[in-house]
């Protein structure tokens, strides 16, 4: 699996791995790259079955497989220890990495994540699946911003959204791969295992997230033994895109604090 690695800003700089959500594209993190690369060696990638890592995914594809293939790619790149920043599905992959490779994951940042899929989130995906079956890739892509962004933010950026729709349609991961990745997301359940995650965790959520209620992050915070929660009052599901200034400050402060906290505990 292909990874994109930024040059380390200094010798032995900590490594931060960015894991996007269901869309799978590493470019999702573009608003964070410049600030992160000043302090960390940053790893971005298109998830298997998407973008520049094309593949046909098995019907039983799972979050555990997503975690294993990423860890193997990191090891192959010479990376043994890394912090993880995961958004939604990416946060699930991050938790799986922390469970399966505890000696490697130094810190976990969960952005609009959850323990197991919420009834409201499931309902949103049911609607989106119906759109996919009835209207194909175009209907899925055109509906997606409604679940990602606040209405006023979208209304002020109509030309940008049209361009994003065209790009997403041109690079659509394919119906079968999308549904198999979505099914992996829906099957994931960390409610009985989260207390085994020992690395420090920062939880970031947006109170106006239409897709994943912020209560999911509260449940995650209660279940994780070493976690802190930060709530953004605005930004929607893709709060790192819509309000990068606020998000980046939380992310940078969280990474610095948790990495220091971990080193002090060693």
UniProtKB/Swiss-Prot annotation:
Pfam families recorded: Abhydrolase_1 (PF00561)
Hydrolase in keyword set: yes
Domain of life: Bacteria
Entry keywords, A to Z: Hydrolase
GO MF, one example: hydrolase activity, acting on carbon-nitrogen (but not peptide) bonds, in linear amides
Keyword check for Hydrolase: yes
Any single biological process term in GO: uracil catabolic process
Entry's EC annotation: 3.5.1.-
InterPro entries in the cross-refs: AB_hydrolase_1, AB_hydrolase_fold, AB_hydrolase_sf, Pyrimidine_utilisation_RutD
Reaction catalyzed: carbamate + 2 H(+) = NH4(+) + CO2
Record-linked PANTHER family: MONOACYLGLYCEROL LIPASE
Family statement: Belongs to the AB hydrolase superfamily. Hydrolase RutD family.
Function noted in UniProt: Involved in pyrimidine catabolism. May facilitate the hydrolysis of carbamate, a reaction that can also occur spontaneously.
Name under which the protein is recorded: Putative carbamate hydrolase RutD
Natural source organism: Escherichia coli O111:H- (strain 11128 / EHEC)
Lineage start: Bacteria, Pseudomonadati, Pseudomonadota, Gammaproteobacteria, Enterobacterales
Designated gene of the protein: rutD
